[in-house]
Design a protein with these regions (language model features):
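N-terminal pro-sequences and low-complexity stem/linker regions of secreted or lumenal proteins
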Residues: 1-172
Length: 172
């Protein structure tokens, strides 16, 4: 929540927001300024970003974690289907880059295999239950490098009016 609105809304530690936040967000401010935004989410469920992890069964690792995506919690996005639909699969980023149709603000969220702290679930296809913290960090570094290369290698990057801001929640 902090990255999308400069506030934490009571989300201390690993807790998710309380479900609905009725305060301004970065996405809402961009829309008011006539700018576009999109959230590119790795392993997002086909049914959307609803307030759950995905997949929702007990036999599969939950790779998409809504707690890493602030937008489903924001009332002004929840209440506007057009804005809510701007949460898309990460794979769409590459098509958008190739067609030069990227938004003014792109928020990219890796799944729980590539977020630098991984999953302890042996069902997770992250590299096995014997993963170490070092492997989690390496996987996150590799994912970040791969994404930066894709972005900076695209025609969109060539105009020079771009920036990449990468954040990591866990100390490295």
């Amino acid at each position: 929540m902090r990255y999308s609105s400069a506030r934490v809304y009571g989300c201390a530690g690993k807790r998710a927001p309380p479900g609905r936040v009725n305060l301004p967000s970065l996405a809402g401010q961009l829309v008011k300024a006539g700018k576009d935004w999109r959230a590119y989410l790795q392993n997002i469920p086909e049914s959307g970003t609803h307030l759950a992890n995905w997949p929702g069964d007990d036999n599969t690792a939950k790779l998409y974690a809504v707690k890493h995506n602030p937008f489903p919690y924001v009332a002004e996005i929840q209440d506007d289907p057009k804005q809510f639909s701007k949460q898309v699969p990460l794979e769409q980023l590459f098509g958008d880059l190739g067609s030069e149709q990227v938004p003014a603000f792109a928020y990219i969220v890796p799944d729980q295999c590539r977020d630098m702290h991984g999953l302890s679930n042996p069902l997770a296809p992250c590299g096995g239950a014997s993963d170490t913290d070092d492997n989690d960090v390496k996987r996150g570094d590799d994912e970040t490098g791969w994404l930066v290369d894709a972005i900076t290698g695209s025609p969109v990057w060539e105009d020079g009016r771009n920036a990449i801001l990468a954040t990591a929640r866990n100390p490295i």
